A protein has these predicted regions:
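Structured catalytic-domain cores with a bias toward divalent-metal coordination
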Residues: 1-391
Length: 391
């Protein structure tokens, strides 16, 4: 870990990827990295590829022990996010809770940064704040939010939301935008801290991010690409917002595709990592994972059922085939300071494992690892995480 700490240096935000969304070895390494960065480098936030509102609930548990973690995971980790309901992530969250019990004056926080869902918790926080601090706006805000907050489980809510006509989804985004702009135009009420006001505005922003994200025409491939770019921009903005308003150094956890600089996937024209580099410059560092062979959890692209999949040894000509020929089975590589011959090799795109939430994936991803990340962690073999959610 000390070698990784030296590579990270003074970076304020570290993006730590994963080559699959369901391998325990990536998650356990993230746990190790988080512990090291918290205990040795002063990091105080872990930000996951998870909706902002879900992060709010998990953070309440991490800080105060509020609620039951198993129940929170069942209720918040749904739909495409259900892969996070695994033993390795719950272990990581429990470590954060244990750390905070021993360091109540200097806690570590959990944050979501994605836009895929806005739970009832956010609507309550915004409307309660308005009722207390700007009671003359209460009727306006409750009217604009009327019928928008989820009243079912998250998966059902999202399924039904995407079945709404495009015009209705566009109208909902317009309503959430008006609430956001209404709050942005107000100063903190007397007796209200600036921080409380800013957090409420951010919660309203997260509600609008979801509504706007789902206001794109999902039957149009070009608009889907625009939505994916919007999603990565939002994820970057939420991380940058947390850093700006808390001062926390942050470990960001997401797929390699998101934390990278290079948009090697045509569906993601600009990545979260590229947006963070624009806003933070050298204060953002990207770490990617690679692996030679192994297993992972994913949901079937045909039936949406979660199961274990396995891939055999990486093919000759792939990035992993060559990376696995090093003397060490598992190792770190600082791409920025590698010998010239290595950097030249890393600058060329080659087939690479890039496994998301669903499998199989017919696409072949050609990635120039040296353009995608600052640091690589290569693992010879990985195994599937222990999934705790519904199939």
């Amino acid at each position: 870990m000390n070698a990784l700490g030296h590579m990270v240096g003074d970076a304020e935000v570290v993006g730590l990827g994963e080559a699959t969304h369901g391998s325990r070895d990536f998650f356990r390494m993230k746990h190790r990295v988080l512990r090291y960065l918290v205990e040795q480098k002063g990091f105080r936030a872990f930000s996951l590829e998870l909706p902002w509102s879900s992060g709010v609930r998990v953070n309440e548990y991490v800080l105060y022990g509020k609620g039951d973690l198993d129940r929170i995971a069942r209720e918040e980790f749904q739909g495409s996010y259900r892969i996070w309901n695994n033993q390795d992530y719950l272990d990581l969250i429990e470590w954060m809770r244990a750390y905070n019990r021993h360091h109540p004056a200097d806690p570590v926080h959990f944050a979501g940064n994605d836009m895929g869902y806005a739970g009832p918790e956010l609507y309550r926080r915004v409307t309660d704040h308005v009722s207390r601090t700007h009671p003359h706006l209460r009727s306006r805000v409750t009217t604009l939010y009327d019928g928008l907050a989820p009243t079912t489980d998250a998966a059902t809510y999202l399924e039904r939301y995407l079945e709404l006509p495009l015009t209705e989804r566009e109208k909902r985004a317009e309503r959430t935008r008006k609430v956001l702009e209404l709050l942005q135009s107000r100063r903190p009420a007397p007796g209200t801290s600036r921080q409380e006001h800013l957090w409420t505005v951010q919660h309203a922003r997260a509600i609008h991010q979801m509504a706007k994200g789902y206001s794109y025409d999902i039957t149009d491939e070009a608009r889907i690409t625009e939505m994916m770019k919007y999603r990565d921009r939002v994820m970057a903005e939420n991380v940058a917002w947390w850093h700006k308003h808390t001062g926390d150094r942050i470990l960001l956890s997401a797929h390699n595709t998101h934390v990278s600089y290079d948009a090697f996937d045509p569906r993601y024209p600009k990545t979260q990592g590229a947006f963070l580099r624009d806003s933070l410059g050298g204060n953002y560092v990207s770490i990617g994972f690679s692996f030679h062979s192994g297993a992972f959890k994913a949901f079937g692209t045909d039936d949406n059922v979660m199961r274990t999949y396995r891939v055999n040894a990486a093919k000759p000509g792939s990035n992993e085939h060559t990376l696995d020929r090093a003397r060490q089975r598992d190792y770190l590589l600082d791409v920025r300071t590698a010998p010239h011959a290595v950097r030249t090799w890393l600058a060329e795109p080659r087939p690479t494992w890039n496994i998301g939430a669903g499998w199989p994936d017919p696409m072949e991803y050609r990635i120039a690892l040296g353009k995608a990340h600052d640091i690589l962690i290569h693992l010879n073999e990985v195994e599937a995480t222990t999934y705790l959610g519904s199939p």
